[in-house]
């Protein structure tokens, strides 16, 4: 692992280099031989006796040793040619960056602007612009081919077992196929059941898909605040998050230099970037929600569309008639965006401008193919408030808005709670599918209990695994700092790894055809005492090695046939291996001693056959004794003499 930056600049240093015993490889789709779809290959030890394991990779070129990273130049703009090739877009000058875009920060506190400037694109006319419009028109885009190839990692090896894996899982109505084709991707997008968040101005993007019939995805939140962090830290957090498996990243910056921070992140991000535009709009009016206007908000949307933001959280479901429903809650309105709009509605005693101008928002977002992430501004902030009328009233409105956005050609996913105890989670998934026409669900956890500040990555990981199993398409991570402070680099990693576990557990439970490949490979390595393979097949090899080395630090311990838990004498796997090895070395004489001449095993009967024969004898004996559960002891003794 290396920390690289351009030696001629003080701009962000980011983590590069491959993960332990891994290498970047590329898959070429048959439908588009010009595409290179990245994946990570975990290289197993020579004695493994099995092939290396390919896994889904979110890390972009940062883990490719053949690529020189220069954050000042940004990543290659590969998608630009795809977008222009399709047509229906125009290049234009774009809006001028204004002082308020960065919070009117003074020169002494202004962050260095990203130097490379690219003119933005926007859609023109009625030609398809969004992935949804292309899908409905029967057109398979390069993005669709790309994500189909990514989703199929491991499925080719598992084709023979795919049906069995699907049958073994419980998908709760999801239609996970044995193999993902570009046509299947197109159909899912056309039906609104999946989205490819991919702004036409985010040319650096490696496309991915969000939907319940695909791998469960996770999102990591980053962003500065008025009191802490910088551009350098946030770019590094983004790269760090995707290194460990974040499929998307949301920039939730609320402090200075919001525009500049976002530009640096976007130009260096291979994953979709989401934002909550109301945060920046609020900064433009000195943090006073009452001063917000539709015109100011719309200008902020244009600004972020031109930069390349892939999805917007918009709290258009927080309506004036619903606010009073939160009055009796234990924790009221906990969403920042929701509370901002609630205050605006009450101050002006008007319906939310996000709701009244929703069709205009759709028209604007369509021009750039920015996806909606319809925000749950009235989500419960405590388990006491879970599944109340305020939460579900907003969800019903989000269903109404979903239909409007779809009619306008926009891609949509729906945000969900929050704080929900385990027994109330499934109704959230079921109601979302019903109200929102199976649009992808994207939830924050949910946290299943409120008693563990400092451990809410665990309280939420439990709920995330459950709702992912029930059909949630993307899980928003929670870090140990939830409710306590702004997460640092270590917290980001902990949150991402926790949610990778939850997402993978959900894929297993749904019966994803290739999900168990990695589990089985690691289990075999564990049984064979291939310690290095165990470490490297895990989600976090570095932590696994560190924990092992705390008690067994010598290199010789990494080939030992025991661990510190049981020691050499009591290791169950070692004992099992010894028994197997002993059985394999037995000669004919020893086997004859174990299975005397005339015994059923010696005659060739299988152990199962011997057991079944014995059970039959005992059944007959039960009948002979009169068929009674309890009998006299003397009678049993006499019966045994006969046998």
From Swiss-Prot:
Leader sequence segment: none
Residues reported to bind substrate: 221, 250, 279, 315, 335-337, 376-379, 415, 442
Keywords, alphabetical: 4Fe-4S, Iron, Iron-sulfur, Lyase, Metal-binding, S-adenosyl-L-methionine, Thiamine biosynthesis, Zinc
Residues involved in Zn(2+) binding: 419, 483
Recorded catalytic activity of this chain's protein: 5-amino-1-(5-phospho-beta-D-ribosyl)imidazole + S-adenosyl-L-methionine = 4-amino-2-methyl-5-(phosphooxymethyl)pyrimidine + CO + 5'-deoxyadenosine + formate + L-methionine + 3 H(+)
Pathway(s) annotated for this protein in UniProt: Cofactor biosynthesis; thiamine diphosphate biosynthesis
Lineage: superkingdom: Bacteria
InterPro entries: ThiC, ThiC-associated_dom, ThiC/Bza_core_dom, ThiC/BzaA/B
GO terms under biological process: thiamine biosynthetic process; thiamine diphosphate biosynthetic process
GO molecular function, one term: carbon-carbon lyase activity
GO CC terms, sorted: cytosol
Cofactor note: Binds 1 [4Fe-4S] cluster per subunit. The cluster is coordinated with 3 cysteines and an exchangeable S-adenosyl-L-methionine.
Pfam families xref list: ThiC-associated, ThiC_Rad_SAM
Keyword Transmembrane helix tagged: no
Function: Catalyzes the synthesis of the hydroxymethylpyrimidine phosphate (HMP-P) moiety of thiamine from aminoimidazole ribotide (AIR) in a radical S-adenosyl-L-methionine (SAM)-dependent reaction.
Entry similarity comment: Belongs to the ThiC family.
Assembly mode: Homodimer.
Name listed for the protein in its UniProt record: Phosphomethylpyrimidine synthase
């Amino acid at each position: 692992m290396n920390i690289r930056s351009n030696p001629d600049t003080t701009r962000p240093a980011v983590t590069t280099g491959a993960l332990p015993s891994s290498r970047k490889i590329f898959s070429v789709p048959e439908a588009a031989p010009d595409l290179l779809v990245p994946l990570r290959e975990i290289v197993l030890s020579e004695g493994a006796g099995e092939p290396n394991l390919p896994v889904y990779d979110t890390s972009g070129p940062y883990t490719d040793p053949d690529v020189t990273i220069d954050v000042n130049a940004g990543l290659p703009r590969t998608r630009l040619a795809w977008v222009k090739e399709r047509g229906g877009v125009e290049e234009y000058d774009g809006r001028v960056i204004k002082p308020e875009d960065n919070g009117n920060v003074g020169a002494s506190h202004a962050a260095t602007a990203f130097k490379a400037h690219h003119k933005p694109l926007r859609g023109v006319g009625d030609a398809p612009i969004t992935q949804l419009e292309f899908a409905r028109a029967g057109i398979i885009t390069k993005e669709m081919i790309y994500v189909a190839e990514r989703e199929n990692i491991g499925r080719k090896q598992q084709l023979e077992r795919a049906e069995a894996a699907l049958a073994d899982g419980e998908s709760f109505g999801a239609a996970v196929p044995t193999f993902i084709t570009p046509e299947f991707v197109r159909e899912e997008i056309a039906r609104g059941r999946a989205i490819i968040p991919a702004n036409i101005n985010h040319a650096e993007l490696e496309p991915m898909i969000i939907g319940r019939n695909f791998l469960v995805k996770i999102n990591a939140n980053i962003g500065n605040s008025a009191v802490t962090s910088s551009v350098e830290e946030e770019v590094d957090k983004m790269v760090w998050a995707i290194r460990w498996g974040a499929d998307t990243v949301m920039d939730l910056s609320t402090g200075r230099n919001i525009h500049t921070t976002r530009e640096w992140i976007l130009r260096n991000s291979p994953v979709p970037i989401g934002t909550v535009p109301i945060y920046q709009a609020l900064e433009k009016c000195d943090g006073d929600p009452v001063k917000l206007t539709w015109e100011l908000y719309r200008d902020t949307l244009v600004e972020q569309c031109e930069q390349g933001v892939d999805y917007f959280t918009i709290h258009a479901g927080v309506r004036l008639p619903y606010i009073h429903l939160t009055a009796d809650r234990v924790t009221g309105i906990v969403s920042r965006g929701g509370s901002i709009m609630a205050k605006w509605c009450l101050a002006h005693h008007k319906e939310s401008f996000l709701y009244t101008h929703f069709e205009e928002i759709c028209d604007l977002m369509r021009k750039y193919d920015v996806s909606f992430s319809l925000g749950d501004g009235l989500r419960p902030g405590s388990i006491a408030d879970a599944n109340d009328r305020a939460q579900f009233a907003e969800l019903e409105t989000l269903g109404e808005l979903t239909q409007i956005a779809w009619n306008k050609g926009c891609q949509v996913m729906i945000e969900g709670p929050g704080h929900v105890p385990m027994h109330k989670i499934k109704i959230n998934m079921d109601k979302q599918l019903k109200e929102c026409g199976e649009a992808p669900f994207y939830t924050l956890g949910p946290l299943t209990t409120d008693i563990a500040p400092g451990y809410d990555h665990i309280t939420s990981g439990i709920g995330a695994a459950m709702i992912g199993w029930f059909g949630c398409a993307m899980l928003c991570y929670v870090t140990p700092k939830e409710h306590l402070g702004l997460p640092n680099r270590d917290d980001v990693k902990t949150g991402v790894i926790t949610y990778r576990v939850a997402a993978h557990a959900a894929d297993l439970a749904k019966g994803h055809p290739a999900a168990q490949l990695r589990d089985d490979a690691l289990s075999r390595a564990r049984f064979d005492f291939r310690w290095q393979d165990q470490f490297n097949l895990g989600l976090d090899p570095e932590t696994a090695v560190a924990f092992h080395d705390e008690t067994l630090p010598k290199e010789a311990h990494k080939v030992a046939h025991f661990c510190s838990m049981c020691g050499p004498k009591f290791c169950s796997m070692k004992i099992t291996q010894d028994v197997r090895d002993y059985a394999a070395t037995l000669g004919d004489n020893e086997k004859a001693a174990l299975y005397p001449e005339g015994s059923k095993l010696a005659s060739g009967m299988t152990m199962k056959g011997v057991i079944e024969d014995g059970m039959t004898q005992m059944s007959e004996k039960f009948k002979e004794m009169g068929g009674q559960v309890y009998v006299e002891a003397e009678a049993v003794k006499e019966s045994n003499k006969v046998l």
